[in-house]
Regions:
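Immunoglobulin-superfamily
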Residues: 1-127
Length: 127
């Protein structure tokens, strides 16, 4: 009896939303979990190009892209592609990075020193 191999094209079980926001300095994880037979190979690209060899970027065995200490230069379109001998499937997300220099609200207390007569000049005739 011959062995029968059932080939199933990849399908994404978990994928990133169309937009992910992160504050500069935080870490972010972009999901890309695929199923298929044979097991799909996951590849991540940024702006259509393979990811650079940056130690902050890690593609985990689950297909997730982990970016440690996000920087402003990490802003852009990321795409994960799952492929096997039966086909491929992809998902994209835009990573938006906001600055970490968020200033607390400034409270200014203004004290007006006026005489009783000055108050009346504003609101009524002062004698």
């Amino acid at each position: 009896i011959d062995n029968i191999l059932i080939v199933v094209p990849p399908s994404l079980v978990r994928y990133p939303p169309s937009r992910v926001e992160s504050i500069e300095g935080n870490s972010v994880t972009l999901n890309c979990l695929a199923r298929g037979n044979p097991r799909p190979h996951i590849e991540w690209r940024k702006e259509g190009l393979p990811l650079t060899l940056d130690p902050r970027f890690e593609i985990r065995p689950t297909g997730e892209l982990f970016i440690q200490a996000v920087r402003m230069v990490d802003y852009g379109m990321y795409r994960c592609r799952a492929t096997n001998s039966a086909g491929g499937v992809a998902a994209s997300t835009r990573l938006v990075v906001t600055g970490s220099h968020i200033h607390p609200p400034l409270l200014i207390t203004l004290v007006l020193m006026t005489s009783h007569c000055d108050w009346f000049k504003i609101h009524r005739q002062c004698g």
